[in-house]
From Swiss-Prot:
It comes from the Eukaryota. InterPro entries: Clathrin_H-chain/VPS_repeat, TPR-like_helical_dom_sf, VPS41, Vps41/Vps8, WD40/YVTN_repeat-like_dom_sf, WD40_repeat_dom_sf, Znf_RING. One of its GO terms (molecular function) is identical protein binding. Changing residue 146 to P: Disrupts interaction with ARL8B; impairs lysosomal localization and degradation of endocytosed cargo. Plays a role in vesicle-mediated protein trafficking to lysosomal compartments including the endocytic membrane transport and autophagic pathways. Acts as a component of the HOPS endosomal tethering complex. This complex is proposed to be involved in the Rab5-to-Rab7 endosome conversion probably implicating MON1A/B, and via binding SNAREs and SNARE complexes to mediate tethering and docking events during SNARE-mediated membrane fusion. PROSITE patterns: CHCR, ZF_RING_2. This is Vacuolar protein sorting-associated protein 41 homolog. Residues 1-33 are annotated as: Disordered. Keywords: Autophagy, Cytoplasm, Cytoplasmic vesicle, Disease variant, Endosome, Golgi apparatus, Lysosome, Membrane, Metal-binding, Neurodegeneration, Protein transport, Spinocerebellar ataxia, Transport, Zinc, Zinc-finger. Residues 1-540 are annotated as: Interaction with ARL8B. Expressed in cerebral cortex and cerebellum. Highly expressed in Purkinje cells. CHCR repeats lie at residues 568-712. Protective against both alpha-synuclein and neurotoxic-mediated injury in invertebrate and cellular models of Parkinson's disease (PD); the function requires the AP-3 adapter complex and the HOPS complex.
Length: 854
């Protein structure tokens, strides 16, 4: 009955722990699996008592005195019947070629697995531990230690005899030993000792902390992290010890090495085993808990923790409760933790079970993320480690992610992820589209559908377009604009739009979309008609892009009404396709539009539309008077008489003045300025432009009885007409506004003219003198005359061949030379001689500068 209660309590606590583990969001660091195959068969009839691990195989000892060699999958490869009682410990050297075994009946065996080498000894007390030298395979290292009531070192002598030496005794049974390099560490009832096999010295003693615990029930756990770091676990205490070299000055009678405890901390549970994992520790803990129902203590599942040692405490990295067979009946001494350094494998050994813990790989990490429904993180992890993952495929994870998002109702995110996950797989795309159709979410996936590489079946795109056409005209129009026309059957969609227009014929969105569909279908005429009806800005682009000028010859007025600027620019840019004559004829009933076209044509080229210049006079007068005068000034083809007639009819004074002056009737023009405009400044400006004395006289005569005009003339006439002529004609007693200022200005202008003349005269005299001096210097220069020069008249050498004969040569400044007798005699009016070639004028540049005689 008590046993049943215990089992019930154990199962209850197990389920509680499992629920807690499920709720935990922290990913485990290790994964676990039972060592099965041959191990399962062994433990059904026997119980495990110890195990040791090599990189190549495992060695398992049992309570019935058997030793089994196993492969890493747990298959039995060899079996040794060592003793009829419990195997206490198995030890292997680093090569895995030699094995040491000790048992409860005092038997010790050390033998070669692949050689006939063997040692047998039976002691009179149980042998609890054995450790062979790590390099036992070497002839110089044939050593091993055993421990019962004392620690013995066995060493083979030169005659192949084994001799033993006592390393330690008197402190109770030796219960644990670990040999690493030249150091042996063991634990007895009092504490932990370390022995240096080279110096034959014991270098430390680390006492145990909790002496209240029975050492046979709570044995010490030892493991070497490296050749100089020993980790000790006993009870709930963990110590990390570092073996260091002692300085020569501190030697005296002390060992050459000493031990320093670099980290020490307490754990929550009793320690059954230790193993290193990089800079962390793996700790197997024996757990006892009190049942809430019965308030009795029971054995709970053992725990495997990864902890980070600190100087005086530790940080828990992960903690897993292990469900091993028969854990309710086990004690702390029944658990062992063995490890394989090469592969970071940890073996949890109990009498009825062997569990293997290993570091989780990327596949395990992805499994955990998928289990926690962290699909996006799982997908990212798979993409980063795609070369290392073996059990997962990126596509499968992605599809699971999409399904998860759909189930959660995140349709837009699911659709967006399809782009990345489905890639170029057309079949998967089509499958997902149908799945979105089934849940009524085609709109969600529509923005992300592939539009090329891959291209899906036309039916897929048509299905989505129909979905939008039924419920969302704007969305439908957007898809038509964005999707290439070759993705779907255009005629099917056109017919569907027409059917909808029968219900709503004035829907601008549908009409515009239909025009775009017509454009894709190259039915440009229908598209243009719709665009013009809608007055859509794309109409000009459509005409240009598809060269539809032949289709718009009868639609020019519509285009001009829509956007006259763009329409005129287009028509003028394409005169070769639609002639000026055709445009003017089409606009005959709309003179205001006709004017806009002809005005822009005139701006571009004054001569192209010359046949319409007469018509333009009336158009400018009617619709655009500000541009009439510039037109009259720039046009050389408009009839002046017609223009004058129109301007006079409309009383356009400025234009009439310009036309009169252009026709040579300046007096009438001036008279109109004076009489119609009463603008003396404009009259003066006009007189200045014409520069005609008679006009000035008329202007003076008209202004003489008008004081304001006289003031204007006095202010502006000074540089064109002598002011005295005006002043003499002013009647005495006439009051003239600002007369004094005007006279002062005249005098100032006169003084300015005098100053300017004097300044100009000075400049002229200075320049003349400078040029005269320059000419004089030039004329004073000598001229070379030699045998190569000829007479320009007779063309014979200028110098005679006989230098003794007398000769006479005339040289001009122009460098022409003549014999004196070849020159004509000077005239009676002027004694000067001139070069016959260069000048016939008096005192020209060819006047003689030198006469040579001999």
């Amino acid at each position: 009955m008590a046993e049943a209660e215990e089992q019930e309590t154990g199962s209850l606590e197990e389920s509680t722990d499992e629920s807690e583990e499920e709720e935990s969001e922290e990913e485990p660091k290790l994964k676990y699996e039972r060592l099965s195959n041959g191990v399962t068969e062994i433990l059904q009839k026997d119980a495990a008592s110890c195990m040791t691990v090599h990189d190549k195989f495992l060695a398992l000892g049992t309570h019935y005195g058997k030793v089994y060699l196993l492969d890493v999958q747990g298959n039995i490869t060899q079996k040794f019947d060592v003793s009829p009682v419990k195997i206490n410990q198995i030890s292997l050297d680093e090569s895995g070629e030699h094995m040491g075994v000790c048992s409860e009946d005092g038997k010790v065996q050390v033998f070669g697995l692949y050689s006939g080498e063997e040692f047998h000894e039976t002691f009179d007390c149980p042998i609890k531990i054995i450790a062979v030298h790590p390099h036992f395979v070497r002839s110089s290292c044939k050593q091993f230690v055993t421990g019962g009531k004392k620690l013995l070192l066995f060493e083979r002598s030169w005659m192949n005899r084994w001799k033993s030496a006592v390393l330690h005794e008197g402190e109770g049974n030796i219960r644990s030993v670990k040999w690493r390099g030249h150091l042996i560490a063991w634990a007895n009832n009092m504490g932990v000792k370390i022995f240096d096999i080279i110096s034959k010295q014991r270098i430390t003693n680390v006492p145990r902390d909790d002496i209240s615990l029975r050492p046979d029930m709570y044995p010490c756990s030892l493991c070497w992290k490296d050749n100089v770091t020993l980790i000790i676990g006993w009870g709930t205490s963990v110590k990390v010890c570092s073996v260091k070299e002692r300085h020569a000055s501190e030697m005296r009678d002390l060992p050459s090495r000493y031990v320093e405890i670099v980290s020490q901390f307490e754990t929550e549970f009793y320690i059954s085993g230790l193993a290193p994992l990089c800079d962390q520790l793996v700790v197997l803990s024996y757990v006892k808990e009190i049942s809430e129902k019965t308030e009795r203590e029971y054995c709970a599942r053992p725990r495997l923790d990864i902890i980070q040692p600190l100087s005086e405490t530790c940080e828990e990295i992960s903690s897993d409760a292990l469900t091993v067979r028969g854990f309710q009946e086990n004690e702390c001494r029944d658990y062992h933790l063995e490890y394989s350094e090469g592969e970071s494998l940890f073996y949890i050994v109990s009498p009825r079970d062997v569990v293997v813990a290993k570091e989780r790989d990327q596949d395990d990490h992805i499994d955990w993320l998928l289990e926690k429904k962290k699909y996006e993180e799982a997908l990212m992890a798979a993409e980063i480690s795609q070369k290392n993952i073996k059990r997962h495929k990126i596509l499968d994870i992605g599809l699971a992610y999409i399904n998860h998002l759909v189930e959660r109702g995140d349709y837009d995110i699911a659709a967006r992820k399809c782009q990345k996950i489905l890639g170029k797989n057309a079949a998967l795309w089509e499958y997902e589209v149908y799945k979105f159709k089934e849940i009524g979410q085609l709109k969600a996936i529509s923005p992300y559908l592939p539009r090329g590489d891959p291209v899906l079946k036309p039916l897929i795109y048509e299905m989505i377009l129909h979905e939008f056409l039924e419920s969302d005209y704007e969305g439908f129009a957007t898809l038509i604009r964005e999707w290439p026309g070759d993705l779907y059957n255009n005629s099917v969609i056109v017919q569907a739009v027409r059917d909808h227009l029968k219900k709503d014929s004035q829907n601008k969105t549908l009409l515009k979309t239909l025009a775009e569909l017509y454009t894709y279908d190259k039915n440009y005429g229908n598209a243009l008609e719709i665009y013009l009806t809608l007055r859509h800005k794309d109409v000009f682009q459509l005409i240009h892009k598809h060269n539809l000028f032949s289709s718009i010859k009868d639609k020019i007025v519509l285009l001009m009404d829509f956007d006259s600027e763009k329409a005129v620019d287009m028509l003028l840019d394409n005169e070769d396709k639609i002639s000026i004559k055709k445009v003017v004829e089409e606009l005959e009933d709309r003179p205001e539009l006709q004017h806009v076209y002809l005005h822009k044509l005139f701006k571009r080229d004054h001569h192209k539309g010359q046949r319409y210049h007469e018509k333009q006079i009336s158009l400018y007068a009617e619709y655009d008077r500000p541009n009439l005068l510039p037109f009259l000034r720039d046009s050389t083809h408009c009839p002046l008489e017609k223009a004058l007639e129109i301007c006079q009819q409309r009383n356009f004074v400025e234009e009439t003045v310009y036309l009169l002056s252009r026709m040579g009737n300046s007096r009438s023009a001036l008279k109109m300025i004076m009489e119609e405009l009463h603008d003396v400044d404009k009259a003066i400006e006009f007189a200045k432009e014409q520069d005609d004395g008679e006009l000035w006289e008329d202007l003076i005569l008209y202004s003489i009885d008008k004081p304001p005009f006289i003031t204007g003339l006095l202010n502006n006439i000074g540089t064109h007409v002598d002011p005295i002529l005006l002043i003499h004609r002013i009647k005495e007693g006439m009051e003239i506004p600002n007369l004094r200022d005007s006279l002062v200005k005249i005098l100032q202008d006169y003084n300015l003219q005098i100053l300017l003349r004097e300044g100009c005269k000075k400049i002229l005299v200075a320049d003349s003198l400078s040029l005269l001096k320059k000419m004089h210097r030039t004329q004073m220069k000598g001229v070379l005359v030699d045998e190569e020069n000829i007479c320009e008249s007779c063309l014979s050498p200028i110098l005679p061949s006989d230098a003794a004969k007398p000769f006479s040569v005339v040289v001009f400044h122009c460098r022409h030379m003549f014999h004196k007798e070849c020159l004509p005699m000077p005239s009676m009016n002027s004694a000067a001689q001139f070069c016959n070639i260069c000048s016939a004028k008096n005192r020209g540049p060819g006047s003689a500068i030198l006469e040579m005689k001999k």
